[in-house]
């Protein structure tokens, strides 16, 4: 039951926070920076595949192994760094015209988002049971 609670909390909070950030708060910035690189319409299958795998990774590597809320949030920072820095640095390296201004903004968002949803997932799931000897 803990896995289900954590997964649902991570998934719901991630979608809500990402929609607010990408669809409202940072929409103009992303549109301006990406210009013609940005698709007119979101490819729903690709977005769904990303969210499903990312929720699973956050739950498995940040939420479930954490003994405390702080540890879940810190592990979320690590997962966020790996995911968002890999994406941004790779794009910056290989896509001609990738805007350098996107790199710190998107990485910072990935850190905030992933750490936050890991903490939310941990709170929803509750602390793990103590190990039995």
Regions found by a protein language model. Give the residues of each.
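Juxtamembrane/disordered regions of integral membrane proteins
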Residues: 1-133
């Amino acid at each position: 039951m803990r896995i289900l609670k954590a997964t649902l909390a991570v998934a719901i909070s991630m979608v809500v926070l990402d929609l607010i950030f990408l669809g409202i708060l940072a929409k103009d910035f992303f549109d301006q920076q990406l210009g013609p690189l940005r698709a007119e319409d979101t490819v729903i299958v690709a977005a769904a595949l990303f969210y499903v795998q990312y929720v699973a990774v956050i739950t498995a590597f940040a939420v479930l192994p954490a003994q405390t809320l702080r540890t879940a949030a810190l592990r979320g920072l690590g997962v966020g760094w790996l995911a968002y820095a890999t994406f941004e640095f790779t794009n910056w390296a290989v896509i001609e015209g990738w805007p350098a201004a996107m790199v710190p903004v998107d990485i910072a968002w990935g850190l905030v988002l992933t750490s936050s949803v890991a903490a939310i997932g941990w709170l929803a799931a509750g602390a793990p049971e103590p190990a039995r000897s």
